[in-house]
Design a protein with these regions (language model features):
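N-proximal low-complexity "stem/linker" segments adjacent to membrane-targeting elements
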Residues: 1-44
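Catalytic-site signature of metal-activated, phosphate-bearing donor transferases
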Residues: 1-11, 93-94, 121-291
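Short, acidic, metal-binding catalytic loop of nucleotide-sugar glycosyltransferases
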Residues: 44-53
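Short hydrophobic alpha-helical runs that function as membrane-insertion/retention elements
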Residues: 53-58, 81-82
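Conserved short acidic donor-positioning loop in nucleotide-sugar-dependent glycosyltransferases
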Residues: 59-62, 118
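Active-site-proximal specificity loops/subdomain of glycosyltransferases
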Residues: 63-112, 121
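Divalent cation-coordinating acidic motifs and surrounding scaffolds
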Residues: 106-114, 127, 139
Length: 291
């Protein structure tokens, strides 16, 4: 259990859930642009994991692709709901906050995930078998570390699932994503990773956060209970497409935009073997010189 700075009195809801409770509703909030090649695998995966609902905020260009073209069956059975935020930029954090405020009263847990993030739970447990364990009874948030996967020496997209194409974990990362308890007052989400609580305009992390594996990524190999398989780069070709979609947090004319591209390229080659072919693909696509 990781302790923060708040006292329980700041939280209106003092949770003490039983694993045998009758209600068990878990949803995911996601936002995406140009993700039709990947979104169906994501939806099918979490359907099988036991998620009850996925809210997808459609951030495609006004005349761009539509999630409905690949998810209509899941939309019709009410597992997926598409919310139109097309044509807007750098809105991931506002959308996460909006989604929590709108839906937190209806769900016990809300997860905030991208379409390249797949929650793995050992022993093939469903998320409900896992998240309603008594060890989480008084927990307001569960943080799952990323394990980053490399490109398996592939350079271009193939019409196969991410889980099939990329099977080599390469880095235990200190970052990750969270599932947050519903019905929390004053919750704010300042980043895509860890929400917190706003008390008199001061931001605090949660009092009780559980990390199934070590926060600094040191126990993954010994204790792989639950973590997120994060296919951050995929291939060089797909990584270019990812960068060209724009940044989740600031506009293209922001002073930090160019440096963010450089940092992302550096991360790409820290995860993947640097080859002339990959460098050429990135330089041509991103119109930048790579040393």
């Amino acid at each position: 259990m990781r302790k923060g700075y708040l006292k329980p009195k700041f939280l209106k809801h003092d949770y003490n859930y039983s694993s045998k409770q009758k209600t068990s509703n878990i949803c995911i909030c996601s936002i995406g642009k140009n993700e039709n090649l990947y979104v169906r695998e994501f939806v099918e995966y979490y359907f099988n994991l036991g998620i009850d609902k996925i809210f997808i905020y459609d951030n495609n260009d006004i005349n761009g692709e539509k999630f409905e073209n690949v998810l209509m069956d899941f939309i019709q059975n009410n597992f997926v709901e598409i919310i139109d935020v097309r044509g807007l930029s750098s809105i991931q954090i506002p959308i996460y906050n909006y989604c929590y405020r709108k839906y937190n009263k209806f769900y016990d847990w809300i997860g905030f995930l991208d379409f390249d993030e797949f929650l793995f739970i050992e022993n093939n447990k469903t998320i409900k078998n896992y998240i309603y364990d008594e060890k989480f009874n008084k927990c307001q948030m569960i943080f799952f570390n990323w394990i980053l996967y490399n490109d398996n020496d592939q350079v271009k997209y193939e019409n196969r699932s991410l889980l099939e194409r990329f099977s080599k974990p390469t880095m235990n990362y200190t970052q990750g994503k969270s599932f947050v308890r519903g019905k929390l007052d004053n919750l704010i989400i300042p980043s895509s990773h860890i929400p917190g609580i706003n008390i008199y305009n001061f931001f605090f992390f949660f009092l009780d956060i559980i990390y199934p594996s070590d926060f600094f990524g040191n126990k993954f190999e010994k204790d792989p209970k639950a973590f997120i398989k994060h296919f951050y780069t995929k291939t060089a070709e797909e990584f270019c497409n990812k960068i060209n979609k724009g940044h989740a947090h600031f506009h293209r004319n922001h002073s930090d935009y160019k440096s963010s591209i450089k940092n992302r390229i550096n991360l790409f080659f820290s995860l993947n073997k640097k080859t002339k072919e990959k460098v050429n693909i990135l330089e041509k696509c991103l119109i930048t010189k790579i040393n």
